[in-house]
C-alpha cells in the first residue's frame, strides 16, 4: 500500500502505484473536516502544520503535527520546544508517506478502507434481534470505561467521550435491552466515516459488529454516499472488512513520542 510498491492488505485488497498517481483521495478531505470539528489548524513550518484541540489537549490525534514532507532536524527541535512551552508531554507526527528519518520514533499505520458504490450488502450477516438506536449516554460511558479506562485512564476516557459526542452521531447496538456495541459516524461531501467500533466481549460472535456496519452501509447507500472506515492493518477486523467488500485506498503513518529523552535529534 506504500506509494513505492503495492502491498496486499487482505484477500483481494491491494492498492497499486498507478492508483496513487492517478487518483485523488477524497476521504482525506472528509477526515480533515472531521478534525476541524474539534481542532484548529495553523502553519508551523515548511513541512509541518499544527492541529490543536484546546478543550482536549491530551488527545494525541487532535493535537498532532501533520507533515507534508520530511521535517528537518531544526523543524523537529522547534516542534519539541513548542510542545514543551505548552506543557504538552508528547509529540505526534502524522502524514501520508513514511518518514525517511523518524527521529527515533516508532511508526504505527492506519489503513483507510472504502466500500465501493454498488457493493451488494444484502448477503452480509446481521442479527435480527439487534436494534440500532442512539445509545443511552450513561451506558455508553460505562461501556467505553470498561475497555478504554484501563488503557487511557478513567478521567480521559470520560472527557474524550463527552467531547466527541457533542459533535458526532453515536449509534448503539442493543440486544436483550443491553448495549452490546457502539460506534460513531461523521458525514461530509458524499462520504460517511464510521469509527471507534466497540463490541462488548459478552456479546461476541452474535454479529453485533456486522449488524452495525450493515445498518450504516444501508443508510449510506440510500443517500448515495460512500462508506469508509479506518483500520489497523495488523488487526483481525481489517480482514473482516475486506471480506465484506471494503477496499484499502490510503494509509496514514503515525509517529508518537511520550518520552522526549528518546528522540534522536
Predicted stretch roles:
Residues 2, 12, 17-23, 68-131, ...:
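Acyl-donor-binding surface of acyltransferase catalytic domains
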Residues 154-198:
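A conserved beta-strand-loop-helix scaffold within acyl/acetyltransferase catalytic domains
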Amino acid at each position: 500500500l506504500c506509494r513505492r510498491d503495492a502491498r496486499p492488505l487482505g484477500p483481494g485488497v491491494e492498492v497499486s502505484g498507478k492508483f496513487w498517481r492517478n487518483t485523488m483521495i477524497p476521504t482525506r478531505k472528509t477526515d480533515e473536516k472531521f478534525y476541524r470539528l474539534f481542532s484548529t489548524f495553523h502553519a508551523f513550518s515548511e513541512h509541518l502544520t499544527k492541529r490543536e484541540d484546546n478543550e482536549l489537549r491530551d488527545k494525541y490525534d487532535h493535537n498532532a503535527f501533520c507533515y507534508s514532507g520530511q521535517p528537518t532536524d531544526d523543524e523537529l527541535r522547534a516542534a519539541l520546544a513548542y510542545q514543551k512551552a505548552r506543557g504538552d508531554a508528547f509529540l505526534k507526527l502524522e502524514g501520508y508517506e513514511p518518514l525517511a528519518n523518524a527521529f527515533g520514533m516508532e511508526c504505527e499505520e492506519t489503513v483507510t478502507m472504502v466500500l465501493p458504490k454498488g457493493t451488494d450488502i444484502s448477503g452480509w450477516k446481521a442479527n435480527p434481534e439487534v436494534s440500532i438506536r442512539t445509545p443511552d449516554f450513561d451506558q455508553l460511558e460505562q461501556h467505553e470505561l470498561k475497555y478504554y479506562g484501563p488503557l487511557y485512564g478513567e478521567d480521559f476516557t470520560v472527557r474524550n467521550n463527552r467531547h466527541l459526542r457533542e459533535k458526532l452521531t453515536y449509534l448503539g447496538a442493543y440486544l436483550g435491552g443491553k448495549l452490546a456495541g457502539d460506534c460513531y459516524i461523521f458525514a461530509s461531501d458524499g462520504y460517511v466515516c464510521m469509527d471507534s467500533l466497540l463490541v462488548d466481549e459478552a456479546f461476541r460472535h452474535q454479529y453485533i459488529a456486522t449488524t452495525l456496519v450493515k445498518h450504516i452501509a444501508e443508510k449510506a447507500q440510500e443517500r448515495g454516499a460512500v462508506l469508509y472506515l479506518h483500520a489497523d492493518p495488523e488487526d483481525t477486523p481489517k480482514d473482516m472488512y475486506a471480506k465484506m467488500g471494503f477496499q484499502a485506498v490510503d494509509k496514514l503513518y503515525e509517529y508518537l513520542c511520550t518520552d522526549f529523552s528518546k528522540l534522536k535529534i
